[in-house]
Curated annotation (Swiss-Prot):
Belongs to the intercrine alpha (chemokine CxC) family. InterPro entries: Chemokine_b/g/d, Chemokine_CXC, Chemokine_CXC_CS, Chemokine_IL8-like_dom, CXC_Chemokine_domain, Interleukin_8-like_sf. Its main location: secreted. GO terms for biological process: antimicrobial humoral immune response mediated by antimicrobial peptide; cellular response to lipopolysaccharide; defense response to bacterium; inflammatory response; neutrophil chemotaxis. This is C-X-C motif chemokine 6. The lineage of its organism: Eukaryota, Metazoa, Chordata, Craniata, Vertebrata. One of its GO terms (cellular component) is extracellular space. It is found in: Secreted. The keyword Secreted applies. The keyword Ribosomal protein does not apply. One of its GO terms (molecular function) is chemokine activity.
């Protein structure tokens, strides 16, 4: 019996099954991430959308308005209108004109129902 290792002893390094798994992961296309489409657009990132705010926009330039409440992704209310030229901007939710516009929008929505 010899104390020297035999030639068939394992050489330290990644195992063949680990290499096969890594190769499989690298060759697998990220299907759900690519094919998510509109669903992925609806999911917000885990950060505030509005890093800077625009002080005000004339209400006639706004085609739609989204108001995002405080949540785990952001500690402040975010007001994001889509303008008629399809651009999205962030408005200051504390501005008096914006508060008035949001209230008017909510009131007109209640009258329609």
């Amino acid at each position: 019996m010899s104390l020297l290792p035999s030639r068939a002893a394992r050489v330290p390094g990644p195992s063949s099954s680990l290499c096969a798994l890594l190769a499989l992961l690298l060759l697998t296309p990220p299907g759900p991430l690519v094919s998510a489409g509109p669903v992925a657009a609806a999911v917000r990132e885990l950060r505030c959308m509005c890093l800077t705010v625009t002080p005000g926009i004339h209400p006639k330039m706004i085609s739609s308005l989204q108001v995002f409440a405080v949540g785990p992704q952001c500690s402040k209310v975010e007001v994001v209108p889509t303008l008629k030229n399809k651009k999205e901007v962030c408005l200051d939710p504390e501005a008096p004109l914006i508060k008035k516009f949001i209230q008017k929008t909510l009131d007109s929505g209640n009258k329609k129902n």
